[in-house]
Amino acid sequence: MAIFLSAITAPTWAQFTGQGAQVATPTVAEILAKPVDGQMVRVQGHLLSKIKSETYTFSDGTGEIVMEIDDDDFPKQPVSEKTKIEVVGEVDTGLRRPPEIEAESVRVLP
């Protein structure tokens, strides 16, 4: 009986494998040129400035894009314009504005 219960309650680590499961690694210039609303992306670069609460200008050296980063997703260590970071987030397009990235996770790179 104990073996049966442990088999039922054992954790599983299944992953979604359908459309959109992979995280793309385009440059900011590529995102700006051909934005795909809802596309998950991974970018590396620097925050250049804070525009307003939870809104920043980000650059990877190929271009600049507005990035929304919730305070809860911000790294614990201080981040300046010299700190290299990696952001995984979702491209958000709008009718009357350039594309943005809504960050899901942010980490400081060595």
Model-derived segments and spans:
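OB-fold and OB-like single-stranded nucleic-acid-recognition modules
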Residues: 10-110
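Bacterial N-terminal signal peptides
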Residues: 1-8
